């Protein structure tokens, strides 16, 4: 009987031992290399139990995982270091913890010192934290000393916090790496090390594009200068350069930093150019990014406003009673090419020359004080057109004025060529209009004004220099961008005297204009393209080479009604 009772006890012991063994062999997320090859269950210990039993504890390591495609270019040692940081326990910095400013492999930081000089330290911690927070970097308020005149040797000493908290010492390595980082492993933001690596890389790219500070001369900026794109400056403020005072043994205060490196002023027509006596901390004229005045070094330049990172110059209203026009900027660039060729070649080595036109809202004080410069025949609503246009437009005086102007300006040889072109299409115009009644001619003018009113809404938002003229060449509409491009004012082209499109072209372009118009007047319905024409400006010694696109608009009778010309400068 005793033997019979012992049998179930032995069975229960074996079952318990097998259950405990199964509990010990709990699956892990990542097996070692030996268990991975043998497809055996591994555990979280290193060396694992199976490798201890087989005597392979010396080579028991985590099995390598298959790399993702987007991590193909990342070095393996960097990935392994990042995995170690991801598996480390979370660390909370105490009040009296010491920080060693040593860069970690995946900490959110700006590019290394190979391309960047040190950031000027200042006691504007809140501004710095706020600005860098938008780019994914969150510097601690303890990282910047309150005394900006400390030398690099004294920077390693502890500094007292204004609220009794101890300041961490600053190593000299901070001045070599830019922004500091912790020497203790930080907790990653994502459970996946690959995702954390990806977002850290994106943060570095954002910092490199928006807050990059170049150490040496490179294709990304001027020597030892801080470049900021206008997209990150408040109030669409332009940018200039502030030279970094790197050779001093102590980090100067921010006020001295701005005063010592203040460039010359560009005061051509701009009332916002700052004088040397202006206060750098004037709250109405500046706002801070990384402790540096933005509006100040945007307007303080001896050359026109330019985004040097992309070699783009600014045109249009400057916020005062002055407009920067294309001829003035081109003249200033030519002066820079002659007087300061180093700056000229460096800007052009980064990117091709380009221009951007600024727009000021209608509610701005600059636009409130301006009188509307519109044609007497311009209408606001379609009802005005049908109510006020009660007689046809006479084209005969326009042709007589055009012929008189051509005879006064051009020699006989060119007049003969233009007369041949005019003779090819003018008889057709006369024949078409002879069969029309007065009501038809009134309807033609109503169609012209109604079409011009529709095109006005498109031209205002297109941003392309545009001008509209009648089939006689009389200018009927001028876009704002065309005035910025050429320097002509609307009242000079529309209100004061009758102007023709040929008055804005040079001699060769005028001859080509008549030859081309004679071909498209009763030919191609869509229009034509002048590959190149030269525009005249109010300054007789300044001419602008442009590419011109024509769009021919006909009325309901098939007669050319208006020509819309789009001009873009050839840089």
Curated annotation (Swiss-Prot):
A GO BP annotation: gluconeogenesis
The signal peptide here is none
Q: Which GO terms describe its molecular function?
A: DNA-binding transcription factor activity, RNA polymerase II-specific; RNA polymerase II transcription regulatory region sequence-specific DNA binding; zinc ion binding
Q: Which SMART domains match?
A: GAL4
Q: Name one GO cellular component term.
A: nucleus
Which CDD domains does the UniProt entry name for this protein? GAL4
Q: Which SUPFAM superfamilies match?
A: Zn2/Cys6 DNA-binding domain (SSF57701)
The UniProt annotation gives the DNA-binding region as 20-48
Region Disordered: what ranges? 1-25, 76-117, 141-187, 216-282
User: Where's the PAS domain?
Assistant: 403-475
- State the function annotated in the UniProt record: Transcription factor which regulates nonfermentable carbon utilization. Activator of gluconeogenetic genes.
Which family is it part of?
Belongs to the ERT1/acuK family.
The molecule here is called Transcription activator of gluconeogenesis ERT1
Q: Origin organism of this chain?
A: Debaryomyces hansenii (strain ATCC 36239 / CBS 767 / BCRC 21394 / JCM 1990 / NBRC 0083 / IGC 2968)
Q: What gene name is given for the protein in this entry?
A: ERT1
């Amino acid at each position: 009987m005793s033997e019979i009772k012992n049998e179930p006890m032995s069975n229960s012991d074996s079952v318990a031992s097998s259950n405990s063994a199964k509990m010990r062999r709990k699956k892990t997320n990542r097996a070692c290399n030996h268990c991975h090859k043998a497809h055996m269950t591994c555990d979280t210990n290193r060396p694992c139990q199976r490798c201890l039993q087989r005597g392979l504890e010396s080579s028991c390591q985590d099995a390598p995982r298959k790399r993702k495609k987007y991590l193909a270019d990342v070095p393996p040692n960097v990935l392994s270091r990042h995995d170690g940081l991801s598996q480390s326990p979370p660390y909370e910095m105490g009040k009296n913890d010491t920080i060693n400013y040593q860069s970690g492999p995946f900490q959110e930081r700006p590019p290394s010192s190979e391309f960047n000089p040190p950031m000027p330290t200042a006691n504007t911690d809140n501004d710095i934290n706020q600005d860098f927070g938008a780019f994914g970097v969150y510097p601690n308020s303890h990282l910047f000393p309150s005394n900006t005149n400390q030398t690099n040797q004294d920077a390693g000493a502890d500094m007292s916090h204004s609220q009794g908290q101890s300041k961490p010492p600053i190593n000299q390595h901070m001045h070599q790496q830019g922004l500091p980082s912790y020497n203790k492993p930080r907790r990653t933001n994502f459970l996946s090390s690959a995702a954390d690596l990806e977002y850290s890389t994106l943060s570095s790219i954002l910092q490199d594009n928006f807050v990059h500070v170049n150490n040496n001369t490179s294709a990304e900026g001027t020597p030892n200068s801080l470049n900021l794109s206008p997209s990150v400056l408040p109030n669409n403020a332009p940018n200039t350069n502030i030279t970094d005072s790197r050779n001093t043994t102590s980090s100067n205060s921010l006020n001295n930093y701005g005063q010592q490196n203040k460039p010359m002023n560009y005061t051509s027509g701009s009332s916002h150019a700052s004088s040397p006596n202006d206060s750098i901390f004037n709250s109405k004229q500046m706002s801070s990014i990384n402790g540096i005045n933005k509006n100040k070094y945007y307007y303080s330049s001896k050359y026109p406003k330019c985004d040097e990172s992309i070699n783009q110059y600014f045109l249009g209203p400057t916020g005062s009673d002055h407009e920067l026009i294309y001829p003035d900027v081109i003249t200033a660039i030519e002066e820079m090419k002659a007087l300061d060729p180093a700056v000229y070649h460096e800007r052009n080595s980064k990117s091709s020359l380009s221009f951007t036109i600024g727009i000021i809202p209608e509610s701005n004080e600059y636009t409130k004080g301006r009188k509307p410069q519109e044609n007497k025949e311009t209408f606001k609503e379609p009802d005005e057109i049908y109510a006020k246009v009660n007689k046809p437009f006479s084209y005969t005086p326009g042709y007589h004025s055009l012929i008189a102007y051509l005879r006064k300006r051009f020699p006989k040889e060119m007049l003969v060529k233009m007369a041949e072109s005019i003779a090819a299409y003018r008889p057709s115009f006369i024949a078409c209009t002879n069969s029309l009644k007065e009501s038809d001619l009134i309807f033609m003018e109503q169609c012209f004004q109604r079409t011009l009113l529709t095109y006005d809404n498109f031209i205002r938002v297109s941003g392309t220099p545009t001008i509209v003229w009648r089939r006689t060449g009389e200018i009927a509409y001028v876009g704002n961008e065309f005035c910025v491009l050429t320097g002509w004012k609307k009242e000079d082209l529309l209100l004061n005297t009758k102007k023709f499109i040929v008055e804005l072209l040079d001699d060769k372009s005028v001859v080509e204009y008549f030859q081309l118009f004679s071909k498209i007047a009763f030919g191609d319905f869509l229009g034509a393209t002048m590959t190149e024409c030269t525009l005249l400006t109010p300054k007789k010694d300044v001419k602008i080479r442009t590419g011109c696109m024509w769009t021919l608009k006909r009325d309901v009778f098939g007669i050319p009604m208006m020509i819309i010309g789009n001009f873009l400068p050839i840089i």
